[in-house]
């Protein structure tokens, strides 16, 4: 998207923080990121590298994580970052920040998933089941018990403000089908309803030294529409690169909804899944090309609206309908 990462990272602030915390800093290297200034910190002593995530003006993502992650871990969602230091350890600092041990970054974590499917499919299936179980635990959190989590009112405000211009661009296109306009009306009504679940994860993963995965990038952490966390996690299964994702989807559902996928969950999951397809199409009009060919997005959305098997949604998304 145009304008991404064009800000100047706050390297001076980063160096000030890490030198206050460590006496053996060797270097501070910026890692491009959307919602914060992220830096890799290395040391002259040879200790393991650290990652500093530093808040940027106008974006409370780091402030929210500092408050929320310890509470989420204490409530059974241990798949979020564990902090070594936060801004609470430097009361005089003007910045919101947290410091963690360096873990395997998202591109390599994604590659590990693809290798796992190629080399050890039973383990990949178990990982998909873990994704489902983790999703169930996240969605079961009460936003009121998670410090700094977005309230239902805040979630509605953010979703409405974000999606309105993109869907306005979509339905303004002369080639926008009637069924898409009707679906957009459903989405607009859906995001105006008080959210009854918890979520806000953006889909990024890190991999720990023991091979486990951690969920990072929570741009809208807090109260969330039903099944929105599940739809994001389901899409992550595409990173296994399976031509037929059926066993992965079955394992995911088994972890997420052990009693089976009832009609209410299916309808909410499908609405969020198709909302992602058409919402991204609208975003492409806003940020990239207002004359973009939306035929493939329309075809995918139409297919998934008429299909009750989530594995079929993933097959089509992977190019294997």
Q: Predicted regions span which residues?
A:
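Active-site activation/catalytic loop segments of kinase-like enzymes and analogous catalytic loops
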Residues: 227-261, 274-292, 300
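Active-site acidic catalytic loop and adjacent metal/ATP-binding pocket
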Residues: 34-47, 184-228
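A conserved alpha-helical element in kinase catalytic cores
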Residues: 50-96, 116-130
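Conserved kinase catalytic-core helix
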Residues: 109-148
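Active-site catalytic-loop/activation-segment of kinase and kinase-like phosphoryl-transfer enzymes
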Residues: 136-137, 147-190
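Short pocket-lining segment of the protein kinase catalytic domain that shapes the ATP-binding cleft
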Residues: 69, 98-107
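Juxta-kinase regulatory segment immediately upstream of eukaryotic protein kinase catalytic domains
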Residues: 1-28
């Amino acid at each position: 998207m145009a304008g991404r990462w064009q800000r100047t990272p706050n390297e001076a602030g980063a160096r000030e923080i890490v030198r206050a915390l460590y006496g053996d800093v060797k270097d501070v290297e910026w890692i491009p990121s959307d919602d914060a200034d992220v830096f890799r910190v290395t040391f002259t002593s040879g200790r393991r590298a650290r990652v500093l995530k530093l808040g940027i003006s106008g974006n409370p993502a780091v402030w929210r994580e500092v408050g929320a992650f310890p509470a989420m871990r204490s409530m059974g969602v241990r798949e979020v970052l564990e902090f070594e230091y936060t801004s609470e350890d430097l009361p005089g600092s003007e910045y919101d920040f947290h410091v963690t041990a360096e873990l395997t970054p998202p591109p390599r974590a994604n590659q590990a998933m693809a290798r796992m499917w190629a080399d050890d499919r039973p383990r990949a299936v178990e990982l998909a089941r873990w994704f489902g179980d983790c999703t169930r635990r996240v969605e079961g959190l009460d936003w009121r018990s998670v410090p700094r989590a977005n309230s239902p009112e805040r979630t509605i405000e953010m979703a409405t403000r974000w999606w309105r211009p993109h869907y306005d661009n979509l339905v303004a296109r002369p080639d926008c089908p009637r069924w898409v306009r009707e679906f957009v009306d459903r989405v607009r009504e859906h995001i105006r309803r008080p959210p009854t679940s918890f979520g806000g994860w953006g889909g990024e993963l890190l991999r720990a030294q023991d091979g486990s995965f951690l969920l990072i990038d929570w741009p809208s952490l807090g109260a969330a529409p039903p099944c929105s966390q599940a739809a994001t996690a389901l899409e992550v299964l595409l990173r296994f690169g399976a031509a037929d994702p059926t066993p992965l989807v079955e394992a995911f559902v088994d972890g997420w909804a052990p009693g089976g996928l009832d009609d209410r969950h299916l309808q909410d999951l499908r609405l969020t899944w198709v909302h992602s397809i058409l919402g991204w199409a609208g975003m492409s009009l806003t940020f990239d090309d207002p004359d973009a060919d939306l035929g493939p997005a329309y075809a995918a959305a139409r297919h998934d609206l008429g299909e009750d098997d989530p594995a079929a949604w993933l097959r089509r998304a992977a190019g294997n309908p």
